[in-house]
Design a protein with these regions (language model features):
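Residues at helix-coil transition
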Residues: 31-32, 91, 154
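Well-ordered beta-strand positions in beta-sheet-rich domains
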Residues: 14-16, 52, 81-83, 108-110, ...
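Short beta-edge strand/loop motif at the mouth of beta-sheet-based domains
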Residues: 33-79, 161-167
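Hydrophobic ligand-binding cavity/cleft-lining segments
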Residues: 1-52
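Hydrophobic-ligand binding "helix-grip"
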Residues: 44-45, 60-129
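Hydrophobic pocket/interface hotspot
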Residues: 26, 36, 53, 86, ...
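Terminal "cap-and-tail" regions of soluble proteins that handle hydrophobic small molecules
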Residues: 6, 73, 77, 116-179
Length: 179
């Protein structure tokens, strides 16, 4: 199984990962602010359909390795917050919510969790992306963040965030054809 995101259509990407933790543990890392903040973003989630989602990203907090913020992300160096609404919530198996989105139009992220041996199969689908640029940005971001999640669940330090992100973003720039 490739760890690369797969383009499903001109507006959708899917990532599949086998994670080294139980479904319940992975669910906690998706839904509990303190755990989610170790790999993605802190913030409140009302775990019900129609519930609010707040995600506060501070990428410098995701790694013990300090490195400069790349120029395109300098405006968000001290953090950025996005808001969404939960569209589906079936603990501990499925979580979907709207995601900020460029041009004021929200996209939608869905996490599906399935037990797999002693671990969990995670399927992450990000839909309703507005452009190829959004798709490349989201693909590089999710690939990097999922790497951090996997490392955290395995009890490892994830390594430098921005260096990994730069590499994955360049990789997806070459992989994702014009939409």
């Amino acid at each position: 199984m490739s760890e690369h995101g797969v383009v499903l259509d001109p507006t959708s990407l899917r990532f599949t990962r086998t994670l080294p933790a139980s479904v319940e543990t992975v669910w906690a890392f998706l839904t509990e602010s303190d755990k989610r903040g170790r790999w993605l973003a802190t913030g409140d989630m009302e775990l019900r359909e129609g519930g609010g989602v707040t995600l506060r990203f501070v990428h410098a907090d995701l790694s013990s390795v300090k490195e400069p913020t790349p120029e395109p992300y300098k405006p968000y160096e001290n953090g950025v917050t996005t808001h969404g609404v939960i569209t589906r919530c079936e603990p501990p198996r499925l979580l979907a919510f709207t995601w900020g989105g460029s041009q004021g139009v929200p996209s939608e992220v869905t996490f599906e969790l399935t037990p797999q041996g002693e671990g969990t199969l995670l399927v992450l689908t990000h839909r309703k992306l507005n452009s190829r640029n959004d798709m490349v940005d989201v693909a590089g971001g999710w690939h990097t963040h999922l790497g951090v999640l996997s490392a955290r669940l395995a009890g490892r330090d994830p390594g430098p965030f921005w260096s990994a992100h730069r590499g994955w973003e360049a990789d997806y720039q070459a992989r994702i054809l014009g939409a």
